[in-house]
Amino acid sequence: MHKLTLDDVDVRGQRVLIRVDFNVPLDTSEDGSPCVGDDTRIRAALPTIRHVLDHGGKAILVSHLGRPGGQPDPDLSLACVADHLGTLIEERVRFSSNTVGDTVEEVINGMSEGSVILLENTRFDAGEKANDEAFATALANLADVYVNDAFGAAHRAHASTAGVAEFMDVAALGRLMEDEIEALTRVRDDPAHPMVAILGGSKVSDKLGTIRALSETADHLLIGGAMSYTFLKVLGHEVGASRVEADRLDTAEDLYEQAEGTITLPTDHVVAEAPEADATASVVEGDIPAELMGLDIGPATIDAYRDRILGAATVVWNGPMGVFEVDPFADGTTAIAEAMADATDDGAFSVVGGGDSVSALTRSGCDDRISHVSTGGGALLTFLEGAPLPGVEALTDA
């Protein structure tokens, strides 16, 4: 999969449409106005933006934010993101309240080389998610060169991630996309062994293809989170009131059998009547009483998983081990984050992806001790299972 990169493109004097992933959490500032709550994804796009500006291109940034349902929503405007970006790059960042159209084209054509503009939320137009040809064409009309740097949205065939590239002569990978693909290709296609994968989260159904793929590639696949209870139930364990995908029991059984011993499941659990901060939490081994639900992996499982991770040469993690945003049920996820960092310190190549996992890394102070922190959740899973990413497939072959 060799695609054009920024190194292959002369952007001087060119209008460069950069699809970034500025789908960031918003907060409220002291004066009541919206502001950026976490700028990790914005910072991740800076190398590409800086390259275009430093090489005399006009940077035209497009992104989605949230789920406005194909119509304008003032609460999901990117205006405050433009302000935040300006402080990061120490440049004026223009903002357009429109995404496409004659007015936007006129503003862009009047921009000087080395300047930047952020256009309004692409999802304010229903044509974005529908990958509408008219909307994709309107985006293409704004630029001479297209660059996709939004790995977090690369698994979606939307107008700004895939459709627009069909109407551009030059469509290239951004720096972030290059880094993501390089790191994840190493994990998927040429991992050093032993390889350990850790998957958590709530649903088996969200990760079917990834579980299948990793159970073939990895030496050990450690399962946590609510989806572990679906597996435990099909193996005959009592899981109490734990969340189970009843319509996926047969699928989970097939996956477990096909994995031929690769999958490891929790042996003890932190349980309570509800996932609440003031709930009475306790640890049970084996079966879970009927009135209780499993909400985190227990200490014995933490020790076992940590040992596996520390023995790995390659380790990849996606998904929390429990309801980590509630303190009594955060220990398992925090322990995995710390074990990942320790394994990296010992020489392992580590990859962490998915919003919850990355958030846990940050909370534990381990985010700078990981080989590669991915900006993708769904895109990471799609890539690891070997499925094509529309946002990459649409780009110009090198």
From Swiss-Prot:
Subcellular location: Cytoplasm
EC number: 2.7.2.3
GO biological process: gluconeogenesis; glycolytic process
An annotated GO cellular component: cytosol
Ligand binding (substrate): 21-23, 41, 64-67, 123, 156
Class in the EC hierarchy, top level: transferase
SUPFAM superfamilies listed in its UniProt record: Phosphoglycerate kinase
Pathway: Carbohydrate degradation; glycolysis; pyruvate from D-glyceraldehyde 3-phosphate: step 2/5
Pfam families named among the record's database cross-references: PGK (PF00162)
Catalytic reaction list: (2R)-3-phosphoglycerate + ATP = (2R)-3-phospho-glyceroyl phosphate + ADP
One GO molecular-function entry: ADP binding
Keywords, sorted A to Z: ATP-binding, Cytoplasm, Glycolysis, Kinase, Nucleotide-binding, Transferase
PROSITE patterns: PGLYCERATE_KINASE (PS00111)
Family statement: Belongs to the phosphoglycerate kinase family.
PANTHER family given in the database record: PHOSPHOGLYCERATE KINASE (PTHR11406), PHOSPHOGLYCERATE KINASE 1, CHLOROPLASTIC-RELATED (PTHR11406:SF23)
Stated name of the protein: Phosphoglycerate kinase
Species assigned in the record: Salinibacter ruber (strain DSM 13855 / M31)
Taxonomic placement: Bacteria, Pseudomonadati, Rhodothermota, Rhodothermia, Rhodothermales
